[in-house]
């Protein structure tokens, strides 16, 4: 059986009973493939509307990126809204802009409605290491205000040192509508909410085939589901189940470490307001403190979903560059997880035939975008396709180099942007 990786999140997960493996033939309205945030959000929105929902998960609820990520509620999409405005028709850009901050609102509504215990903390910081990055943050401030975010504050060098005890930054953008959570506990809470709403979840039930039709037939090793609709929500862990999706996306790994417990006083000395933080580099660092006062620090990207040989060797120098005062601190957990990157860094939504839908490729902004995706999926199945189609109409292209050479091509591009970050150009 495939279990959760040995992460801090798995070690501190809320108590929960495992879900059964599918061993029978079922019929339902919607079969959701994948119990990460995309699948859970879709299933919960649909179950609340009265749909009969079955969720099939190859491993455990929140096994992939949804249970391993940095836990940061980051608003917007991975690609800035100005790029969308410059490349999309005005009506489409307007729709996409109107949804920039909706994902975080959905998360908070879920936490409140279902009393999900996941260490929700408010506030997130985007920190600039160079004047060029700070100038870009000022532009982002103006754009986000235009689209309705009135919880923003620009911080100068003095201001940023009041929210993070580091000399690394020249300024920052504080988004008080951002925040952070224990990501696995959020996923587990949402799964329980699906159960409360009458949905069925099956773990250790990897899908082996999808046969289109009315109804569609979804098979696992020991069972099958006939469904009016199918939602493909495997993201970076989908494998080759749907080959036509593979060429336009690429799994990438990112690494996270968790220190020993620092104690509340020392943890607050690092991040006095308990905000989460990410920098503005192309290959960015991100970090926050946990509910039990550890520092969780992540960064770097491994293209092609290969596990890094030594996570501590990669991440500890990054942590000490930001917080040299932690040189004496032990690291207790290290792990990696895959997210799905698209060439445009915009999510991929679409249809495979009349009744099979997919949402994937959040490119590092999955915590919020996945929750929005589930809501939009429930809308389109209820006959309201406009907002879903605003994403579905976004163009997507294969990675250069094909399956054999796309990793070195993409890594070379990332190395170029990393060099630009270091040079401040």
Model-derived segments and their meaning:
Residues 28-55:
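N-terminal Rossmann-like FAD-binding beta1-loop-alpha1 element of flavoenzymes
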Residues 2-12, 79-85, 106-123, 128-189:
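Flavin (FAD/FMN) cofactor-binding and adjacent substrate-gating region
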Residues 305-307, 312-422:
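C-terminal catalytic lobe of FAD-dependent flavoproteins
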Residues 48-68:
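Glycine-rich FAD pyrophosphate-binding loop
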Residues 105, 113-121, 207-209, 224-354:
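Active-site substrate-recognition segment that forms the wall
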Residues 139-143, 168-228:
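Helical element adjacent to the flavin cofactor pocket in flavoenzyme catalytic cores
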Residues 1-30:
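Extreme N-terminal leader/targeting segments of oxidoreductases
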Residues 68-98:
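Glycine-rich active-site loop/strand segments that organize a redox cofactor
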